[in-house]
Amino acid sequence: EVTEFANLENTGITIDENPVLKYKDPMGNEFHFVRTYKPVCHDYPYYLPIMNKYYSDFDMAGLVTWHEGQNAPDKVLTVHSTGDVDSGNFGAAEPAYIRNLLLAMEKNRAEAGLDSFRVVTEATHWSGMMYNGGHPELIPEYKVPIIDIEIGSTTESWSDGAAAKAMAKSLFSIFKGDGKKLYSILCVGGVHFEPAFVNAVLQTEGDKAFAISHIIPNQWLVSGKYEEPEGMEKLKKCVETINGGIKGIAFHDGLKGMYKDQMRTLAKEYNIPAFKHQLLRRPNDIAWIE
């Protein structure tokens, strides 16, 4: 669908017997489009060397694919950062670009009249674990910020041409910010498709805006034993992968006390506020440390 919005040129690179195409926008931003045999995370040992060979110096990488899963919501345009929360292996993340993409997806969804679709974020994860695509320790070996960009979660949604076009058009806006002062936050707790975190991006008013990247849901805090000392080390590793660091930690109010305590300890370590998710609706009430 990207060919509807840009004139693509051949780069001279071939991956999986497919030519890699490129587009340079009026601002000089260059986009490469790579068609692969299978989703990259399904065979990381194969694709990681290719990514590092051709795209180790790029600013952002996006894996455009479909979303599915048991009890997964349908008619969604979704974005998530990469990482295996249980083991504490996180990919690089760029909050500003994720925010730009989410805003563009919401704008294009509305303009296309896709009233039955919603823009959502998912908890940080890596589908390589599900598809035996490699060991999670491979994730940090790709240093470029990387996200999954998906349409879900049924064949009807996957074949929806208007949704595909809205998503494709959004890709070209990933470097286009709106000039607001951004507050990058680590999001912790809640469910896999936690609405509080994406709403913080889509519904922020005024000159202060939230940017999100890694989202650690309640279920993987528990299975990853994040209440233990090793859990704190995993949290620090997570923060260190976020470009520009973080300005605060938003935790879901439903978290158990021991996890809230961990977030407050982590916040003290970085000299930033930790706050309940309800405050995401009132950014001016947060005790930011400028």
Task: Please provide the spans of the model-predicted regions.
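Acidic, Ser/Thr-rich peripheral helices and adjacent loops at domain boundaries
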Residues: 201-219
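N-terminal catalytic or cofactor-binding beta/alpha core of small enzyme domains
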Residues: 1-143, 154-155, 161-165, 169-197, ...
